[in-house]
C-alpha cells in the first residue's frame, strides 16, 4: 500500500519530466531564438511556423523559439546579455551594435560568412550599406540588418474628404503641413476631440525633424550641436505648431489617447501622424475600416532634406563565453535561413514589417501599394549615431529638456543650453574613466 501511495505521489513529477523530453530534439544541437511574437499575439502562429519549417528541413539542429511582447523584450534581452545568459540568436536595435560588439558579447558574423563554402551563404549585397555600416565593429559585421524601418506621414482619407480634400492635397512642406492640419482640428466644450497633426505624436522625434534641415544632434567629434540657430528654429516650430491650444488641453487630449490604449491615428483622433511601417499592421490587426494613405514626411520650406529615422532591428548571435562551437554553427545555419529571400518574405507576412532583404521586399510589396510607398522611404532612412558616453541620447537624456521646452517651463534657448551642458558633462565624465 505504501509503495502504491509513493508511486501516486511521484506520478506528477514523472509525467512532468516525460513531458519535458521532446523527441524532436534527440541527438540534435538545440539553440534558443528570441523574438517579439509571444503566445496569444496575432503573429505567434506564423512565427512558430517559420521556426518549425527550419526544424523540419534538416535533422541536425533544433531551434526553440520564445516570444516576448515588444516592451518586455528589451528588458529581457538586456538582462540576459549582461548575465551572459542570452539566447543564441535575438533581435536588437541596429544603431547600437557597436557597444555590444566592443563588449565582446557578439559573434563576428563576417568571419562566419567568409568561412562558409555552402551554396546558401548570406548574400550581403541584398542588404543596404546604410544599415550595414551600423552593424560593423572594427570593419567586421557583428550583426545583420533584420528590418528596414522607415517613418512616413500617414493621412486619413475619410477625414480629408470631410473638408473636400484628396491625396493630391497632402502637404509636402512644414508650412503646408501646419496650414493643412488646422482644417481638421475639432474642439467641443474647450476639449480637443480631434487634431489635424502634432509634431510630437506617433514616431515623430526632435532629431528626425532636425535631420531634415541638414543638421545633426552631434558633430563629427560627438560634441552636442545644441547651441545653433537651427536647433532653436526646429524646437520653436515644434512648440508653436499647436500654440492656439493650451498645454493643458493638449495634455488632456494626449492622456485620453493613452487611456484608449491604441494609436491616436488608428482611433481616428488625428488626421495625420508620423509613424513607421508597423502602424499599418496595427490598423489591420485592430480591424480598422477607414481609408488611409502614406506619403514622405513634409520637409522645411527652404533647403529641406528628404530623410527619416530608420531605427530598424538587427539580428545578432550572442557569445555567452561558453565556447560552444556546435551551437555557434547551428546559430549561423538558422541565421542563413532567416536572412534568405524566401524566409524574409514570410517574416514580412507574419509581422507586417518591412524586412531588410532588398529583393525579397520588392517582391513582397509588388501588389501592396501602401507598403510599396513605405519601402521607397527606406532608401531615405538613416539611423542615429552611437554615442558611447550617452547611448540613450535621444531618449532618457534628451526627453526632460524637450518636455520643459514644450511645456513652457523653460524657453527654447534655455532648454537647449541646459541640454548641451548636460551632454558635455556626460562626455567629460565618460572620458575621465575610459
Ranges and model annotations:
Residues 20, 125-126, 295, 348-396, ...:
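Long, aromatic- and glycine/proline-rich binding clefts that accommodate carbohydrate-like moieties
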Residues 67-76, 172-178, 251-266:
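Short helix-initiation/N-cap motifs at beta->coil->alpha
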Residues 52, 56-57, 163, 243-247, ...:
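Extracytoplasmic/periplasmic substrate-recognition and gating elements
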Residues 69, 94-152, 178, 209, ...:
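Hinge/lid segment of periplasmic solute-binding proteins
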Residues 110-127, 170, 187-197, 215-235, ...:
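Short, solvent-exposed loop/beta-turn-alpha elements that line the ligand-binding surface or hinge
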Residues 18-105, 115-122, 167, 254, ...:
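Conserved N-terminal structural module of periplasmic/extracytoplasmic solute-binding proteins
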Residues 178-183, 221-255:
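Glycine-centered hinge/linker elements that transmit conformational signals in sensory
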Residues 137-146, 151, 175-225, 270:
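Extracytoplasmic/periplasmic solute-binding protein
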